[in-house]
Amino acid sequence: MPAAAFLGLLSHLGYFIHGEHHMKAMALFQASLLLPPALTLATAYLIDLTILEATKIVAVLLGTYLISLFTSILLYRLFFHRLRGYPGPFFARLSKIWHVSKLAKKDNHKHLQRWHTKYGKYVRTGPAELSIADPDAIELIYGPRTKCTKAPWYDISLPLVSMHQNRNKREHDRRRRTAWDKGFGAKALRDYEPRVVGYAELLVEQIGAFSGKPLNASRWMNYYSFDVMGDLAFGKSFDMLKNGKSHFAIDLLNKAQGAFGLFSPAVWIFRILTRMPIISADYKKFVSWCENQMLERQKMKVEKPDIASWLINSPPLSDDPFVNRMWLAGDSRLIIVGGSDTTAATLTFVFHYLAKYPAEILKLRKELENVNINDNEALQSALRDLPHLNGVINEALRLNPPVPSGLQRMTPAEGLDIGNHHLPGLITVFVPSYVMGRSEECYEQPYEFIPERWYSKPEMVKRKDAFIPFSAGAYSCIGKQLALQEVRTVTAKLVTKFDVSFAPGEDGTTLMEESKDIFTTELGDLFLTFTPRK
């Protein structure tokens, strides 16, 4: 027994306390299942014992080992860890399992809001993790000259990898430069404009067909963004707007991303579960569907430029065909999730606030009086600089950012200084977007929807550098301008054609209370009426 106890202590201090182990999670899990029976059989054979006698001996030894191991881990995390001085929920200091256990409703962003309200700007949300609601941290963690790197979270889907999830900065920058930058450059965006406008007009037409009857705006904004994504990314529409019903892939996406919302705080749990056939079925179906979209696109001949063409024709990142295939599959999923979920969420929240504050619609219409809404060729340049339109969109993004809980980074080995705080090296840090959007340090009246704060009342934005709904620096969202193009176009066309209001019995509560943080946002229902303008 003393030897088993010593081995448990040695395992922690000599191995588990050092480096990253999330990629070995499945191997460790399998070992924990296979080792006890193997040791039992070996003990029975070598010492000539019955299975029952051997089982008792192994149980005592393994029990002693595990008690020693976990006692050492817990004592270290409580009293000796480099983050021991930072406040936070007690059980969060011990294990990320506790954090996962709080997320049955997939509302991580709201938990973070409560924790920051209780504990302050720096909250320990895991054994080696800090959530930081400090505007001074943003440039140092996400800015172009940051020394922080991507955290272990980005390994969550390996071997599937995308530009977004790649932790190797050199590979990330090469992929962005040779493929993604071209697919989202100024010329490419101009080429996409007619299709963005075309789908916006189809959305207007389909909403008009309701003749003022209630409709689920969350669904229709999803139909629009998914159809645009399909066309611009893979050269084909999914015809959701045309058919007025959801594509099965949206349900797959929500189920697959739902696992992110629940388990992504503990990457090692996610990696174990996604390797269990029954549990991971929906996730694997979605990943397979994403990969198939890219494979089908590779076989197509398209006349109009699309994003996939730049990805397919870019120089390979490896001599291994499997690695290159995983890149395309990962980038395919990135396009589908990033290109549909985020745009749909922003549009839905924009129209929630317009229904709640109808005076904003009148302001938008006045601003749009000098814009020919039917001149599709000049529309984007006309909308781009409209202050109130952009103010409405910015307010929706501030209060309901596309990635509510923020993006994780790892501090450099030497640590990171933020004001009077010296953060230890090689810990996970992040700035929660949802929390920052409601920060009184950054905004006057942070809970109020005031579009003018972005142009005529700049004093209401105390820290403009805290507004990063599309992240910042080298890892900022490459689809930002396309997303804004889509949101501006739909907003302008709909408020020009319709009066917007909550449907009878609707007040927006369901959207606000039931939307889920699944890394991006899975929308709750929002029933609106769009009545033709008189």
Q: Which residues make up each language-model segment?
A:
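Conserved cytochrome P450 K-helix E-x-x-R motif and the immediately C-terminal K′/meander segment
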Residues: 105-112, 288, 292, 377-419
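C-terminal helix/juxtamembrane-tail motif
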Residues: 518-534
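Hydrophobic, well-ordered secondary-structure elements that form the walls
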Residues: 364, 396, 426, 449, ...
